């Protein structure tokens, strides 16, 4: 049976260069212990929408693409529902430079996927959720460069300046000239600007969002966007879509390098855990059995929801329904976020 403190022994044995990163189990996202209950087969409802909203300009964003690209939005039903909103599909937030994609309203089945033997008690029961409004969601996790543009600092463990001097010396010892070593590390530093920001707390994210008029997605919005109408535990082969312990080389990676889902979102699973706006409730789904509309979680509690898995954890955490949680003041190199906005 899995330890609810997320494999403290495993974390202590992770790759050597993460030794300076706090791996205390007290700071880990926490998951419930799985049960042996056989998951039910759930059929997703019809999610079509009849919106006739006229095409709308957005004062807060620059429009990159008005209509959804069928090469990106590969689900025909989702493509039609996005177009039916009349809203621009792909936009860039002016205050942060974050690229965002439109998610249409609709219904989906939230929680344990049919046949998912790894589903935990807090993912049950699966239940119907209706989201009545479209929303925008960051195409990727917030990057270090985007965070620095707004916050003016970089709290990340994996940041560009951390080991550059020692890397230059190492490259010179390997035969490169000083100028060659500096050029090589400069490129690597530029790449790291596109790594996800991490070591940010839920409270830090709230401050970022207050400055940009963005917000964290609700847990329901997050899972809806992650699934993209897929009722399987993941939206693709986990090695193709996510960075996790077996393929991450013990670190985060540049966003957008794995395959996206059918809505065009990258790294919904793996790379870093993502904060959601909701207060975490372990038994919350039991109150949702009859279906819910625009849910925002429980009203009381101390912890906040975390979703998606991380570069340092097993692949079974990279599941669309997996639910974790953490203290809102918790900062560590396994946790980042992506932003949302209501049009």
Residue ranges of each PLM-predicted region?
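Mature N-terminal segment immediately following signal peptide/propeptide cleavage
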Residues: 96-109
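C-terminal motif of bacterial Sec signal peptides marking the signal peptidase cleavage site
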Residues: 23-24
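Bacterial N-terminal signal peptides that target proteins for export
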Residues: 1-12
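A short, contiguous structural element within a folded domain that forms the immediate neighborhood
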Residues: 242-265, 297
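Active-site microenvironments of metalloenzymes and redox enzymes
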Residues: 55-72, 107-119, 128-239, 277-285, ...
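Short, low-complexity, disordered segments immediately C-terminal to signal peptides
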Residues: 30-46
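Surface-exposed recognition segments
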Residues: 55, 116-130, 230, 249-251, ...
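N-terminal pre-domain segments of enzymes
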Residues: 44-90
């Amino acid at each position: 049976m899995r330890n609810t403190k997320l494999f403290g022994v495993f974390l202590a044995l992770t790759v050597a260069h993460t030794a300076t990163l706090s791996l205390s189990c007290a700071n880990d996202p926490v998951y419930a212990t799985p049960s042996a209950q056989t998951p039910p087969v759930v059929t997703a409802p019809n999610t079509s929408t009849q919106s006739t909203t006229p095409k709308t300009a957005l004062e807060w964003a620059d429009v990159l693409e008005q209509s959804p690209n069928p090469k990106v939005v590969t689900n025909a039903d989702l493509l039609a529902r996005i177009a039916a909103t009349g809203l621009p599909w792909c936009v860039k937030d002016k205050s942060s430079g974050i690229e965002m994609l439109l998610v249409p309203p609709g219904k989906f089945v939230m929680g344990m996927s049919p046949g998912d033997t790894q589903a935990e008690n807090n993912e049950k029961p699966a239940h119907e959720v209706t989201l009545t409004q479209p929303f925008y969601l960051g195409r990727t996790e917030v990057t270090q460069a985007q965070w620095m543009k707004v916050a003016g600092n970089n709290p990340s463990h994996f940041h560009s300046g951390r080991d550059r001097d020692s890397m230059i010396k190492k490259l010179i010892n390997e035969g490169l000239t000083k100028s060659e070593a500096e050029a090589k590390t400069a490129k690597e530093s530029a790449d790291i600007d596109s790594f996800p920001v991490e070591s940010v707390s839920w409270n830090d994210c709230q401050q970022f969002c207050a400055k940009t008029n963005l917000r964290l997605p609700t847990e329901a919005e997050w899972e809806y966007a992650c699934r993209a109408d897929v009722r399987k535990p993941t939206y693709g082969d986990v090695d193709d879509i996510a960075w996790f312990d077996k393929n991450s080389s013990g670190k985060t990676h540049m966003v957008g390098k794995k395959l996206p889902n059918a809505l065009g979102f990258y790294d919904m699973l793996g790379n870093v855990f993502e904060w959601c706006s909701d207060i975490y409730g372990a038994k919350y789904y039991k109150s949702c059995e009859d279906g819910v509309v625009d849910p925002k979680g429980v009203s009381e509690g101390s912890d906040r929801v975390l979703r998606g898995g991380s570069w340092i954890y097993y692949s079974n955490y990279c599941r669309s329904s997996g639910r974790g949680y953490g203290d809102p003041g918790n900062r560590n190199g396994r946790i980042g976020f992506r932003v949302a906005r209501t049009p």
